Amino acid sequence: MADGVDHIDIYADVGEEFNQEAEYGGHDQIDLYDDVISPSANNGDAPEDRDYMDTLPPTVGDDVGKGAAPNVVYTYTGKRIALYIGNLTWWTTDEDLTEAVHSLGVNDILEIKFFENRANGQSKGFALVGVGSEASSKKLMDLLPKRELHGQNPVVTPCNKQFLSQFEMQSRKTTQSGQMSGEGKAGPPGGSSRAAFPQGGRGRGRFPGAVPGGDRFPGPAGPGGPPPPFPAGQTPPRPPLCPPGPPGPPGPPPPGQVLPPPLAGPPNRGDRPPPPVLFPGQPFGQPPLGPLPPGPPPPVPGYGPPPGPPPPQQGPPPPPGPFPPRPPGPLGPPLTLAPPPHLPGPPPGAPPPAPHVNPAFFPPPTNSGMPTSDSRGPPPTDPYGRPPPYDRGDYGPPGREMDTARTPLSEAEFEEIMNRNRAISSSAISRAVSDASAGDYGSAIETLVTAISLIKQSKVSADDRCKVLISSLQDCLHGIESKSYGSGSRRERSRERDHSRSREKSRRHKSRSRDRHDDYYRERSRERERHRDRDRDRDRERDREREYRHR
């Protein structure tokens, strides 16, 4: 085309676009989210392609000024009716729900959105379904509750806050009852409820029927075999991330399956498998554990047959890692992490664990009386290769003295520490005596106690000269304590001996002498209150004078 024709075509369509907006006024009320998830047109074009076709110039043979009709066929009329479908199992996927709805003759599904727990991403058992006509919604409300979906009859309700709160309460009750009984929820038939299924079976606002990506891989589904087969275009659902109950031994992956490397970059969000849950009895890098079968567990590849039940769990489980699960065996050893309680640790010459690992989640192995599942060699004393702790027995010097004995101090260091301790002792005694003479016994006692603790914590506390300093401080402390508690009674006893008064008078004097300290403190507090009252009166008088002056 020539340049002039292009300019004419572009600016001539402006009027048509305004006519189209007036003709399809119902589109103003359509949410942008609904436009994205709406089904394709009859000609197989995506919504983006339709928008692009709207802006294409007409052909040369068309009349530009006549306002030709648009070449896009709109199948969505802008009407959208939302329903809640509840009483579903947690492993029900959007494909299952779509098949059940299509079996009723309803083909205008616009949206299926499952409500999920924020903590683990597990379905709450109800979903929001949007259809494009009133007849479809009535058909769903009448016929779908009569259909059985995974052993349960769905409940179809209108979309409002009342039914939403009812479904939320029901999901909380089911979660709490499952936790109280100590058992996980019932899993899908033919597989283990604790198997690590990839995420992607349940749609999050996607149009139902989307084929999942080809890079998904199923995890092990039981104690020793691959998961059950699923139909084409349908992925297995996700289990709860933290199922209660004792973990069992993992099974090998299906034959001929290649797992992606653990550090190959983050996958797409929709195709990302859920992070594996690690228990304290499971090495890092292995698939999640399945339930215990009735009878002896099958042998684990690469570790030999376990002779008995798994050891009890010790400590809290570590947080789920960001790596996909890997099978044991020839794929390589797990990452540099501390071993679980029932497996031997690395040899003493092995490198320490990575800095991002919290050692508190991986306690060292203890002798719990259970046989280990590995007999390749005696386990070392410490998983990090540290020397064994020194056992002093029930009696012996404390650890500080042992450190002093191991690393002897030089003469200069010893004299420096001793001079420091002497200065602390002399200053503490002088200050305590001055405080006690002023009547502040609490400050004097605190000063002496602090000095004693500082000298005891020094490196030369085991020396005889240091012990002499400590004993002098303790004698001063006892003297001040006895003086603070019994000063009044001593005065009265001396008066008794000098004046030989009667017992009644001595009792009176004792009570008076005991009350003198209290009266002294009370009088001081009263004086403080009087000063405060005087200050308040002065402030009030000043305020009054200021107000009077302003008038």
Swiss-Prot record:
One of its GO terms (molecular function) is exon-exon junction complex binding. Residues 405-551 are annotated as: Necessary for RNA-binding. InterPro entries: CPSF6/7, CPSF6_RRM, Nucleotide-bd_a/b_plait_sf, RBD_domain_sf, RRM_dom. SMART domains: RRM. Residues 81-161 are annotated as: Necessary for nuclear paraspeckles localization. The modification Phosphoserine is found at S494, S500, S511, S513, S525. GO terms for biological process: co-transcriptional mRNA 3'-end processing, cleavage and polyadenylation pathway; mRNA alternative polyadenylation; positive regulation of RNA export from nucleus; protein heterotetramerization. Phosphorylated. Phosphorylated in the Arg/Ser-rich domain by SRPK1, in vitro. Symmetrically dimethylated on arginine residues in the GAR motif by PRMT5 in a WDR77- and CLNS1A-dependent manner. Asymmetrically dimethylated on arginine residues in the GAR motif by PRMT1. Residues 510-551 are annotated as: Sufficient for nuclear targeting. The modification Phosphothreonine is found at T157, T404, T407. Residues 220-265, 285-366, 377-388 have a biased composition (Pro residues). Residues 169-180 have a biased composition (Polar residues). Residues 389-404, 489-503, 515-551 have a biased composition (Basic and acidic residues). Residues 504-514 have a biased composition (Basic residues). Residues 169-411, 477-551 are annotated as: Disordered. Signal peptide: none annotated. Its main location: nucleus. One of its GO terms (cellular component) is mRNA cleavage factor complex. Residues 481-551 are annotated as: Necessary for interaction with SRSF3, SRSF7 and TRA2B/SFRS10. Residues 1-213 are annotated as: Necessary for interaction with NXF1. Belongs to the RRM CPSF6/7 family. Component of the cleavage factor Im (CFIm) complex that functions as an activator of the pre-mRNA 3'-end cleavage and polyadenylation processing required for the maturation of pre-mRNA into functional mRNAs. CFIm contributes to the recruitment of multiprotein complexes on specific sequences on the pre-mRNA 3'-end, so called cleavage and polyadenylation signals (pA signals). Most pre-mRNAs contain multiple pA signals, resulting in alternative cleavage and polyadenylation (APA) producing mRNAs with variable 3'-end formation. Contains an Arg/Ser-rich domain composed of arginine-serine dipeptide repeats within the C-terminal region that is necessary and sufficient for activating mRNA 3'-processing and alternative polyadenylation (APA). This is Cleavage and polyadenylation specificity factor subunit 6.
